[in-house]
Structures are given as C-alpha cells and as structure tokens.
Amino acid sequence: MTNINRLSMSTMFNALHEILNEEPLAIPPPPSRGGYSYFHIRTTEMDLQRMFNFMTGSEDLKDDISVLDTGMLMWMASFLTSDSDYFMVITRNKNGSKSLQKLMRMSDDMDVFFFVAIMRLFIHVMIDKYASYVAIQGMRIFKQDKRELMYDHILRYALFLARDQYGCIALNEIIKELDDPYYRDELMDIVSNNALLLSNDAYGNFVVQHVLKLHDSRCTGNIADKLCGYCVELSFKKYGSYIVERLLEVRDIPMATIVLDLLACKTEMLIRLARSENGNFVVCKLLELTNDILTADLFYSLVNKLRPYRFLLHRFPESKIVAILGSMRVPN
C-alpha cells in the first residue's frame, strides 16, 4: 500500500467529494459478520488508498480537516474504523496515529466509532509503538463511561502489557496520567504485588522502576516486601540491579531490606556480588548512601563483612568500593 505514489491533498478532497456525491450522504454502519455491508459496496481499493494517503501523508492534519463539514467527518470516522485490518494499518503508521488522535477530538459522535474500534482490537493497539498512542488519547478525551471500560481492560491485561516491548511504554504512560483514584490504586497494586515477576523481566522492570519513581509510600513498601529475600539475586542481573538501585534511592525501609538481604547471604556470595558487573554498582551505592541513614549496627555490620576481603576487590570497577571501605573508621 505504501509503495503507491501519494496523491496530492487537492486530489484527496476531490476524491472524497466524488465518493460522497455519488448518492445522498449516509453514515455507513460497521460491516456485519455475514453478507455485504454498505461500507463494502461503496469502498473500492482506490478509495482505501486515497484515505490512507490522506491520513498518513502529513504530520499536521489540523488545517486539512478544518475545511470538512460534520457529515464528511462522520463518514471518515466510519470509513476508518469499519474494517479492523484497515484501522490497524492506519494506527500503526506514525502520521496515521497522529491524524487519528486529531480526529478523535472533533465530536462525541465520532468518538463512538473510534472507541468501538479500539476496544475490538485492544491488545493489538496497546502493544504497537504508534497505535498505542491512539488508545491513550482515547483515555484522555472519551466520556467517563468509555474511559472506565478501557481502564477495566488495562487492569485485566496489565501484566501482559508490562512484559511487552511497547506495551510497557504504554502502561507507564497510563500510570502517569491516570487520574481516577480507584483505577490508579488498582493498577499500582497489580504492579507492586507482582514486583518479583516484573523485576526479572526485560520490559517489566521498567514498569516497576516507573512506579518507584512516583514515590507512593504504600506501593514502594509493598514492592520492598515482595522483593525481600531476592535483592542479592536481583543485583546480579542487569535489569534486577536497576530495581535494587531504585529502592536504595527511596531509602528508609527499602534500604534496610536490602542491607538485611546482603547480611543474610554467605560471605562468598557477597564478595561475588561486589566483584560482579552489575552487583558492584549496588554495593557501591549502598555504602555511599547508608552511612547517614541506617542505624549504626546495620551499616557497620555490612562494612565489617566486606572489609576483610578488600584485597579481592582491587580491580576496576570495584576499586571505588575499596576506597569507600578504606576511608571509614569502624568502631570496635
């Protein structure tokens, strides 16, 4: 489809008028499961290509659609959403996604078409790089009852989305913008209650990090509780170490949880962690932050466990740990 030469904007307007003037304007219903709908009778391959070019040919559709009357805009909304495959082709295109988002602001009647199409293809829309922004726009501007139905779907598929390359980005955007207290708390609870699963996932860990950045004390405490006993294991891993470092930045209870995990592990394991590619950053950050925050017994217990093995840490990048340990005076 994209290999066909793009038609000019004036040609597109002429084509729209030609299609609409063949007979009195009527808003076609979505296609039925059996037989042929009005949409299929009127729609030709050329019509589909013209509309595709119109929707994807410009980054700014605002001026182009400002000259269209209500009837034509309603017809466009139906045309774009009546066929699922065609709707996805438009939404997956960068400019097409932006154009649809602009059309979604035009009227509540038009938004009904877009809402139905998004809900019909919810997962496909949410895990696409550009299509997901169409759904997010819907959650901003649709009426409350429609937004709540979309939120219900988000809660149902939250863990699936969190572990998808683009789904995790969309989910983070929704968490950031969600202003309904009930749905926000429910979504945050899903993330925090599944913190261990998500922290071990290449994409899910970004969602846990995002929630920790929001500094919600209830969710942060819940995440720390779910990860208690697993901080050493996570610190060895690239993505898991990011979560542990985020918990350290929160301080207080999460930091104490991490120190207790490190103290509970065998000395051999702790030294391996301090020498590992990812774990050394966790140990170093822990030593830098805990001196003025933790109780003396916890802090010096960790220092005393590491200091006898400083000679094993004399290599890059662990040399920073050695310098920190060497600068500390540990009380007898």
From Swiss-Prot:
Source organism's superkingdom? Eukaryota
GO cellular component annotations of the record: cytoplasm
**Start and end residues of each PUM-HD domain:** 1-302
Chief location of this protein within or outside the cell: cytoplasm
Pumilio repeats: from-to residues: 82-117, 118-152, 153-188, 189-225, 226-264, 265-300
Provide any one GO MF term from the record: mRNA binding
Q: Which GO terms describe its biological process?
A: post-transcriptional regulation of gene expression; regulation of translation
Alphabetically ordered keywords of this record = Cytoplasm, Repeat, RNA-binding, Translation regulation
Question: Known PROSITE patterns for this protein?
Answer: PUM, PUM_HD
> Where is the protein localized?
Cytoplasm
Print the domain comment field.
The pumilio repeats mediate the association with RNA by packing together to form a right-handed superhelix that approximates a half donut. The number as well as the specific sequence of the repeats determine the specificity for target mRNAs.
Protein purpose: Sequence-specific RNA-binding protein that regulates translation and mRNA stability by binding the 3'-UTR of target mRNAs.
Q: What is this protein called?
A: Putative pumilio homolog 17
**Source species of the chain:** Arabidopsis thaliana
Q: Tell me the gene name.
A: APUM17
